[in-house]
């Protein structure tokens, strides 16, 4: 995956403003729209050390994450006092396993993850520059079982007003990337003038948006 050194340096220097200390409230609020069943296999790309993994593991028997940074994965298990089984895979990846959770370290595009029934993407698509998104979405489609669903959280703002990441990925681009899939907007949270992205970054508008994407 390109820009690997960028993300390795972010984790190494603890510059992880993108990390949320708690479960993203949009996950429990909108997860039911994906019609989840306990036996559904869930994939979380570019998962970091997200608390969302813990929440998902209480709802599903199999949750797989993929994360480039070994620092992030080790921190996740240490902070939750989990002792995972660690298995090296082909010199390129490691698999960390604990109960319902499995996390692969290494490049998402080559990680040997299982086929998934539901993908949860809160911070993956928006972390990638535009020239990588088509390849990323192609990989998601490859990993999604027939009838699979994606719960996508994305951002929408004038890209020329702020350099990403996180990048702006508006509805029009989502529809292009997922042509042939059913795309449903579940929520648009439009920021007011007090939001840090507007008050401090000077953006003219900023919204966090939730989409359900379904294979047809």
Swiss-Prot record:
Any one GO MF annotation of this record: thiopurine S-methyltransferase activity
Protein name, as recorded: Thiopurine S-methyltransferase
Keywords: Cytoplasm, Methyltransferase, S-adenosyl-L-methionine, Transferase
Encoding gene per record: tpm
E.C. designation(s): 2.1.1.67
Family to which the UniProt record says this protein belongs: Belongs to the class I-like SAM-binding methyltransferase superfamily. TPMT family.
Principal localisation: cytoplasm
SUPFAM superfamilies per record: S-adenosyl-L-methionine-dependent methyltransferases
Pfam families: TPMT
Keyword Cytoplasm: yes
Top class in the EC scheme: transferase
Positions that bind S-adenosyl-L-methionine: 11, 46, 67, 122
Swiss-Prot/TrEMBL GO biological process terms: methylation; response to metal ion
Origin organism lineage: Bacteria, Pseudomonadati, Pseudomonadota, Gammaproteobacteria, Vibrionales
Annotated localization: Cytoplasm
Gene3D superfamilies per record: Vaccinia Virus protein VP39
InterPro entries membership: SAM-dependent_MTases_sf (IPR029063), Thiopur_S-MeTfrase_Se/Te_detox (IPR022474), Thiopurine_S-MeTrfase (IPR025835), TPMT (IPR008854)
PANTHER family tied to this protein: THIOPURINE S-METHYLTRANSFERASE (PTHR10259:SF11)
Organism: Vibrio parahaemolyticus serotype O3:K6 (strain RIMD 2210633)
UniProt entry tagged with the keyword Ubl conjugation: no
GO cellular component annotations of the record: cytoplasm
Record's catalysed reaction(s): S-adenosyl-L-methionine + a thiopurine = S-adenosyl-L-homocysteine + a thiopurine S-methylether
Family matches, as NCBIfam families: PRK13255.1, TMPT_Se_Te
PROSITE patterns given in the database record: SAM_MT_TPMT (PS51585)
């Amino acid at each position: 995956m390109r820009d690997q050194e960028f993300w390795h340096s972010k984790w190494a220097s603890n510059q992880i403003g993108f990390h949320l200390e708690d479960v993203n409230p949009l996950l429990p609020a909108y997860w039911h729209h994906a019609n989840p069943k306990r036996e559904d296999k869930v994939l979380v790309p570019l998962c970091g050390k997200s608390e969302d993994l813990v929440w998902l593991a209480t709802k599903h028997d199999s949750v797989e994450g993929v994360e480039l940074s070994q620092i992030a994965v080790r921190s996740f298990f240490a902070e939750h006092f989990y002792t995972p089984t660690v298995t090296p895979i082909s010199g390129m990846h490691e698999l960390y396993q604990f109960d319902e959770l499995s996390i692969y370290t290494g490049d998402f595009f080559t990680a040997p993850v299982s086929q998934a029934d539901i993908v949860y993407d809160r911070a993956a698509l928006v972390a990638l520059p535009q020239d990588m998104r088509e390849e990323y979405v192609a990989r998601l489609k490859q990993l999604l079982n027939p009838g699979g669903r994606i719960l996508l959280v994305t951002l929408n703002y004038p890209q020329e007003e702020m350099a990403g990441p996180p990048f702006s990925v508006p509805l029009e681009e989502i529809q292009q990337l997922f042509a042939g899939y059913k795309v449903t907007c579940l929520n648009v949270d439009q920021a007011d003038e007090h939001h840090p992205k507007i008050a401090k970054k000077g953006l003219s508008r900023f919204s966090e948006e939730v989409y359900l994407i379904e294979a047809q």
